[in-house]
Structures are given as structure tokens and as C-alpha cells.
């Protein structure tokens, strides 16, 4: 099942969890970038590739969740998994933050994709936000807002 995400990648800082929940483990200067450079890097991820799951993930190895091992500072070897990036688009770039959308196969770790994007841009990076907008035929755009439900309830006397 295909999934679509909107993500924000902060360049120049790498956290141990690849997201804002972690601690910064590395800082690097961010090279001068423009949208052409970023678009070329994003396009390089299109198609089939392999990705190593992050230590801070729910994936199990020998019956143990990786995040559980990571919290004990135990790092184990992880097998690369095949992923497919169907579409990836730059939405915005300012203040060393890349906003992008990605349509990908199940099992794709967007945090790892963000780290890999930063590496191809000759720096480090971690996600600062991630929002899944679509899964299969379900889209957040088709969802009903809670305020709409509350108004329906009030107007119907519930």
C-alpha cells in the first residue's frame, strides 16, 4: 500500500533518533543550496532502492524492538530493505529547512530518507516534522474535521 507524507528536514543538525525527539549528535555547516540543487537530489531518490531501518524504530530483530535496544545504547546490524519512492517534491526551502512531500511504498522510513537527502547535499539533517497525508485510497483531505462533527451534533440536538 502506498503512503504519502509531508516532511520538514532541518539541515545542519543530526539527532540520534533522526527527529526532534532525539539529542543532537552532530552539527555540520550547510553548503550554499538552491532549489535546483535540492530538486536534483530529491529526484535521485525516485524508483527502487534499499534502506537500512533506523535503530529508533519498531522493527523487530530476534524478537526485540530496535528502539528498545537503542535506548540501551545497543546497536545491531540491520538488513537493508527494498523501498520504492514513486514521487518526491520540494514544497519549500528556507532557513536551511527543506519541506517536501513523498509518495512511497510501505516500510519506507522517512526519517532515514531525510538523513540520506542531507548526506547527498553534503551535510547532516534530521526531520523536524512528519505528517502522513494518504494511505492507499484514504486521504486526510477527505477526512471530516472534528469541528464539523460537533456542529452536526449540536444542530441535530445530540
Q: For the regions a protein language model found, what residue spans apply to each?
A:
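Catalytic/RNA-binding core of pseudouridine synthases
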Residues: 1-158
Amino acid at each position: 500500500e502506498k503512503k504519502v507524507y509531508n516532511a520538514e528536514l532541518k539541515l545542519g543538525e543530526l539527532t540520534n533518533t533522526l527527529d526532534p525527539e532525539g539529542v543532537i549528535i552532530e552539527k555540520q555547516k550547510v553548503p550554499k543550496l538552491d532549489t535546483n540543487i535540492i530538486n536534483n537530489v530529491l529526484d535521485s531518490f525516485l524508483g527502487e532502492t534499499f534502506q537500512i531501518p533506523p535503530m529508533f524504530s519498531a522493527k523487530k530483530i530476534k524478537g526485540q524492538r530496535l528502539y528498545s535496544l537503542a535506548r540501551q545504547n545497543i546497536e545491531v546490524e540491520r538488513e537493508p530493505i527494498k523501498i520504492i519512492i514513486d514521487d518526491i517534491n520540494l514544497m519549500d526551502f528556507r532557513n536551511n529547512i527543506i519541506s517536501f512531500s513523498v509518495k512511497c511504498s510501505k516500510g519506507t522510513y522517512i526519517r532515514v530518507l531525510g538523513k540520506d537527502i542531507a548526506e547527498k547535499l553534503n551535510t547532516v539533517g534530521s526531520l523536524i516534522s512528519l505528517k502522513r497525508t494518504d494511505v492507499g485510497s484514504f486521504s486526510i483531505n477527505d477526512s471530516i474535521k472534528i469541528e464539523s462533527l460537533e456542529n452536526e451534533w449540536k444542530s441535530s440536538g445530540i
